[in-house]
């Protein structure tokens, strides 16, 4: 049995992505831009989103973190997501779960444009994953499968 060194694998992936981002810039193409949405200030969610923003910075991606109060209405959160869906500068959207109890995770996930759903949670992307078709894969299960 071989033991996987997660730190080394992570660094190798980051190094590869840095090269790809540099190639995009050299070719005059747009640098990928992740929009992360954090509702409330739950500790584990803060840590996870901060790690994503840091990872973006390390590889040369742009990132935008939108922090919203835990009391935001579902309607207002859906409006924020729609703005991100239609913003041509945003390539990927991550809404950190869990959401406050008064907001439906399912409605929020459904509102994310499947082409910008970096978690792969949108029903269209989940269906493509089950069928073995190209799609975004949720990071943790994908990492385990590697």
Region spans (language model):
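Short beta-strand segments enriched in small/hydrophobic residues
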Residues: 31-40
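Glycine-rich phosphate/diphosphate-binding loop of Rossmann-like nucleotide-binding domains
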Residues: 39-54, 135-146
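Glycine-rich loop at the start of a catalytic domain that most often binds anionic cofactors/ligands
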Residues: 46-53, 79-81, 106-109
